[in-house]
């Protein structure tokens, strides 16, 4: 097997957290040491970003935002890329299935956000994935490749060095269901093969593709053994000390 690119373990805390929950968790992350080359990213709520940034001193970890809009101005309730830059944030998660489902973010909206974020110097975790209905209808490939193609249409080849793809089967998020390693690998391989055919071997080889569907310490190691899985985007389990074990599984 060819060597994998540097793995990433990303924590998406979603709309969760309080100081009483997060401070002990951050202390656990600060105390963690890893004997392999892994990149760790934590995405708190917007309100918890300053506290997390101040308290999370382990140099292995970087802070991400869970969303952003491309412009500042009269957009009540939103946070722009420029505001995130002012706070020293260099990572952002875009296109999460919950943003697509609950806030009507289309492939085109997500693609424009990704392009603007890359142009502004951010590293971007771009989420793609299919619903249970789409999987049952045999449309997994069509759905995820359409999502990916919309992003690719907006990006230069140079911008891909800032992009990480996260495959999150919507049917496995927060449900306790998890894709088998073989199911996950099938989609990861499909995504990498598409990138190779459209953008070239070099971009495909260095692209990190994360798995993001009900990842736990119990299944992470087996999932990471798959050739095209380069790490994880973790939801619920990232709010527990278990996240350290998931990070350790990426070796």
UniProtKB/Swiss-Prot annotation:
Pfam family name, one: TIM
InterPro entries referenced in this protein's UniProt entry, alphabetically: Aldolase_TIM, TIM_sf, TrioseP_Isoase_bac/euk, Triosephosphate_isomerase, Triosephosphate_isomerase_AS
Localization in the cell: Glycosome
GO MF, one example: triose-phosphate isomerase activity
UniProt GO cellular component terms: cytosol; glycosome
Membrane spanning residue stretches: none
UniProt-annotated binding residues for substrate: 12, 14
UniProt KW Isomerase keyword: yes
Active-site positions on this chain: 96 (electrophile), 168 (proton acceptor)
Entry's EC annotation: 5.3.1.1
Residues making up the signal peptide according to the UniProt record: none
Annotated keywords: Gluconeogenesis, Glycolysis, Glycosome, Isomerase, Peroxisome
GO BP of this protein: gluconeogenesis; glyceraldehyde-3-phosphate biosynthetic process; glycerol catabolic process; glycolytic process
Family: Belongs to the triosephosphate isomerase family.
Subunit structure: Homodimer.
Name of the protein described by the UniProt record: Triosephosphate isomerase, glycosomal
Organism (species): Trypanosoma cruzi
Lineage: Eukaryota, Discoba, Euglenozoa, Kinetoplastea, Metakinetoplastina
């Amino acid at each position: 097997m060819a060597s994998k690119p540097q793995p990433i373990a990303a924590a998406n805390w979603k709309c969760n957290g309080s100081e009483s929950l997060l401070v002990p968790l951050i202390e656990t992350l600060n105390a963690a040491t890893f004997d392999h080359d892994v990149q760790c990213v934590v995405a708190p709520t917007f309100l918890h970003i300053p506290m997390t940034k101040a308290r999370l001193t382990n140099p292995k970890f970087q802070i991400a935002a869970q969303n952003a809009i491309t412009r500042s101005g009269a957009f009540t309730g939103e946070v722009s890329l420029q505001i995130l830059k002012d706070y020293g944030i260099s990572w952002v998660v875009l296109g999460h299935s919950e943003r697509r489902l609950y806030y009507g973010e289309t492939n085109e909206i997500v693609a424009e956000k990704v392009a603007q974020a890359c142009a502004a110097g951010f590293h971007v975790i771009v989420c793609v994935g299919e619903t249970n209905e789409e999987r049952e209808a045999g449309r997994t490939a069509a759905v995820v490749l359409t999502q990916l193609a919309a992003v690719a249409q907006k990006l230069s080849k140079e911008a891909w060095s800032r992009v990480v793809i996260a495959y999150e089967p919507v049917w496995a998020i927060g449900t306790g269901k998890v894709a088998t390693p073989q199911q996950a690998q099938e989609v990861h391989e499909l995504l990498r093969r598409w990138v190779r055919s459209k953008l070239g071997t070099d971009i495909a080889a260095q692209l990190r593709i994360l798995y993001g569907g009900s990842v736990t310490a119990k299944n992470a190691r087996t999932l990471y053994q798959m050739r095209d899985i380069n790490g994880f985007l973790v939801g619920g389990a990232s709010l527990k000390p278990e996240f350290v074990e998931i990070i350790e599984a990426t070796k």
